[in-house]
Curated annotation (Swiss-Prot):
Keywords: Hydrolase, Metal-binding, Zinc
Reported cofactor(s): Zn(2+)
Species of origin: Prochlorococcus marinus (strain MIT 9301)
Protein name, UniProt field: Probable aspartoacylase
Domain of life, per lineage: Bacteria
UniProt: Zn(2+) binding residues: H13, E16, H105
Entry-linked PANTHER family: ASPARTOACYLASE, SUCCINYLGLUTAMATE DESUCCINYLASE
Enzyme Commission number(s) from the entry: 3.5.1.15
UniProt xrefs under Pfam families: AstE_AspA_cat (PF24827), AstE_AspA_hybrid (PF04952)
GO molecular function: aspartoacylase activity; hydrolase activity, acting on ester bonds; zinc ion binding
Binding site residues for substrate: R54, N61, R62, E163, Y273
NCBIfam families attached to this UniProt entry: PRK02259.1 (NF002601)
Length: 301
């Protein structure tokens, strides 16, 4: 394995402050060099972080497009230019090339500590399987959603998002900080084991595969006219079947799930997703057998 540099990003969203604090604490205690691998710690969106807002112009975590967006002279959005900088500086062909990117996020939803993957890349599966095996973390596999693209970790050959919640925006929570520190340290340990060919993958891993998103009930003007049903609050990762309540509207009417297919919801009531017209996303559960190819591709870096 020839991984030489790994990028750890916090503050991709400026009002998610706990990952920034965790990295600050962690980097003071731990050397940036770890058995020949250098770790780069960076705030993804420093301007938004300074202002305590999610972003300045557009969502940075939707700004890493595959084509046409990496010309700084063609776009005046702060986040697009910031994405350009991060790729130019730390991308695989950048001045400080990183082979892996880990993006740290918090959520207002009760997601616990979870892993988010984008697509079915072997190297991503390898890291995710090791973390799930160690901590039992749920994995949200996001793929094939044309409405949501341009995620940061997709711009690197390997990358995972670590998502921890629930915690309010711009609110420090030491328990959340401690969880991030634990995950960062464990990632470094697992990557070191991979480098020295000391890992054994679990036989399988369980993933929750993105299927779509559900908007809030809306009135004739398009305004939100319903809230998350009390029975659904804090029930991320819990199965929903036909007839289960989803929303309670302003007239007291319960909006139920009407499909026959079982689903598992994630990001229930995430505050930042209201602007995206998402009350929750939903998934199907899938068991995936581990493959030797995952480790082999890591070794081929």
């Amino acid at each position: 394995m020839t991984v030489q540099r790994i990028l750890i990003v916090s503050g991709t969203h400026g009002n998610e402050i706990n990952p920034v604090w965790a990295v600050k604490q962690f980097s003071r205690k731990e050397n940036s060099l770890n058995n020949g691998i250098e770790y780069e710690y960076i705030i993804g969106n420093p301007a938004a972080y300074e202002k305590g807002c999610r972003y300045i112009d557009v969502d940075l975590n939707r700004s890493f497009k595959e084509s046409g967006n990496f010309d700084q002279h063609k776009n005046s959005f702060y986040e697009t230019n910031r994405a350009n900088f991060l790729v130019d500086e730390f991308g695989i062909d950048g001045s400080k090339p990183c082979q892996i990117a880990i993006d740290l996020h918090t959520t207002t939803a009760n997601m616990g500590t979870s892993i988010v993957m984008y697509g079915r890349r072997s190297k991503d599966f390898c890291l995710a399987a090791l973390l799930q095996n160690k901590f039992g973390l749920p994995i949200y596999l996001h793929e094939k959603d044309k409405a949501q693209t341009g995620f940061l970790v997709e711009a690197w050959p390997c990358g995972l998002v670590i998502e921890i919640g629930a915690v309010a925006q711009n609110f420090y929570d030491q328990n959340i900080v401690n969880r991030f520190s634990l995950i960062i340290g464990s990632l470094r340990e697992e990557i070191d084991k991979l480098k020295n060919k000391l890992v054994e993958l679990p036989k399988e891993l369980v993933v929750h595969v993105h299927q779509g998103s559900i908007d809030y009930p809306r009135d004739e003007k398009g305004d939100i006219d319903g809230i998350i049903h009390p029975a659904r609050i804090n029930q991320d990762w819990k199965m929903i079947k036909k007839g289960d309540p989803l929303f309670l509207d302003s007239q007291g009417i319960i909006h139920k799930y009407e499909r026959d297919k079982l689903i598992w919801p994630v990001f229930i009531g995430e505050v930042a997703y209201k602007e995206k017209k998402i009350a929750m996303s939903y998934t199907k559960k899938e068991v995936i057998c581990s493959k030797k190819q995952w480790v082999q591709e890591f070794e081929s870096f």
